[in-house]
Amino acid sequence: MPIGVPKVPFRLPGEEDAVWIDVYNRLYRERLLFLGQHVDDEIANQLIGIMMYLNGEDESKDMYLYINSPGGAVLAGISVYDTMQFVVPDVHTICMGLAASMGSFILTGGEITKRIALPHARIMIHQPASSYYDGQAGECIMEAEEVLKLRDCITKVYVQRTGKPLWVISEDMERDVFMSAKEAQIYGIVDFVAIETTSNSLTN
């Protein structure tokens, strides 16, 4: 079984011989980005860097962010979301497999009318969690206050991006709410559910 990231040939403009680069590097050149892991600072910084580079390279071409993520760090996810709103090109979001927690938050941050879920994708929303480490009582109180601020921020974004009333989002975030692709479309997290006859539209 092959180990590591697969490599593909790529020929630079003006060069006769192709060089081998990893498949993700090749796809980034086509403005196709991937979030296929737990959301942490490292992957967030990578995605932010790529989006900023592509934004500077050509502001007229859309970007496509494919998501299969169980979620992760709240601030890392928010930083990706904010960058998606900052760059000039529209960012399409496509859910493959699972977009849970911060994964669904990033999914809903795609350009409205350009958020897609594949037919068997699953989407989950819930409130941000805290580590509640063993520390001073005052530190725990400060952390709890910060979690409440983050929850308020995330709730307001879901309200804005889905069109759902504040009370609905607040109530649903009290627990893990899983949705099918169609349910996520009805909820407003995505705009379309992809079907085989329109699969080519994901990159066109």
Swiss-Prot record:
A molecular function (GO) term: ATP-dependent peptidase activity
Q: Which reaction does it catalyse?
A: Hydrolysis of proteins to small peptides in the presence of ATP and magnesium. alpha-casein is the usual test substrate. In the absence of ATP, only oligopeptides shorter than five residues are hydrolyzed (such as succinyl-Leu-Tyr-|-NHMec, and Leu-Tyr-Leu-|-Tyr-Trp, in which cleavage of the -Tyr-|-Leu- and -Tyr-|-Trp bonds also occurs)
Where are the catalytic residues? S101 (nucleophile), H126
Q: Which UniProt keywords apply?
A: Chloroplast, Hydrolase, Plastid, Protease, Serine protease
Q: Which residues cross the membrane?
A: none
Set out the biological process GO terms recorded for this chain's protein. protein quality control for misfolded or incompletely synthesized proteins
Record's keyword annotation contains ATP-binding: no
Q: Where in the cell is it found?
A: Plastid, Chloroplast stroma
- What is its EC class? hydrolase
Question: Which N-terminal stretch is annotated as signal sequence?
Answer: none
Supply the EC number(s). 3.4.21.92
| Cellular component terms (Gene Ontology) | chloroplast stroma; endopeptidase Clp complex
Which is one Pfam family of this protein? CLP_protease
Its function?
Cleaves peptides in various proteins in a process that requires ATP hydrolysis. Has a chymotrypsin-like activity. Plays a major role in the degradation of misfolded proteins.
Q: Read off the PANTHER family from this record.
A: ATP-DEPENDENT CLP PROTEASE PROTEOLYTIC SUBUNIT, CHLOROPLASTIC ATP-DEPENDENT CLP PROTEASE PROTEOLYTIC SUBUNIT 1
Query: What is the annotated quaternary arrangement, including any partners?
Result: Component of the chloroplastic Clp protease core complex.
Task: Give the family from UniProt.
Answer: Belongs to the peptidase S14 family.
Q: What is this protein called?
A: ATP-dependent Clp protease proteolytic subunit
Q: Which organism is it from?
A: Anthoceros angustus
